[in-house]
Amino acid sequence: MSLIKAIITPVTPFQQNAPILFCEDTKKCAFVDPGGDLDILLGAAKDNNLIPEKILLTHGHIDHAGGASELASMLSIEIEGPHKEDTFLLDSLESQGNMFGFQARNCIPNRWLQDGDEVTIGNETLQVYFCPGHTPGHIIFFHAESNLAAVGDVLFQGSIGRTALPGGNHQ
């Protein structure tokens, strides 16, 4: 049985985690929520001899999606996720970037995801769960065999993610 492993890499001035998930067998990887600092993410992948396969987005905030379009262009890889309810956020990444001093390009995923979908990394399959609240289109990725989840901002250390942002809902 192969496992999915994670390299946790904090990026952006917000220091949000941008995990690099990879298949132990194939060394193929997915960049999850590449908000920025792409040189750091690419360096971590190279240092671990990983083969970039795709980008996975949990939601459309600047610190999670701000570098996705640029990274996809640089590596000729596709973007999967989030749920289409976050379209308004992905369409405003440039303006979000201007507010926070980030360089960002608006983003259109190659594939929108919804509850029950599956995504692959190498030989492994992860389940997609729709978890709105932090944003209307927030999703998470779960690999049961590895007991590993990439949850974006649904959970913070010691609490739930913020829900008082545009489109958020505490319910």
Predicted region positions:
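Alpha-helix N-cap/loop-to-helix initiation residues
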Residues: 14, 61-64, 166
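Residues that act as N-cap/strand-start positions at coil-to-secondary-structure junctions
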Residues: 3, 15, 105-107, 113, ...
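Short, flexible loop segments at the rims of nucleotide/cofactor-binding pockets, characterized by
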Residues: 6-10, 31-32, 55-58, 127-130
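Metallo-beta-lactamase
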Residues: 95-96, 118, 124-171
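Divalent metal-coordination and catalytic microenvironments
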Residues: 21, 33, 59, 71, ...
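Conserved beta-strand hairpin/beta-sheet module of binuclear metal-dependent hydrolase folds
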Residues: 2-48, 140-152
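Active-site HxH/HxHxD metal-binding segment of metal-dependent hydrolases
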Residues: 29, 36-120
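Short, function-defining helix-loop hinge/capping sites that tune catalysis or transport
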Residues: 18, 41, 67, 91, ...
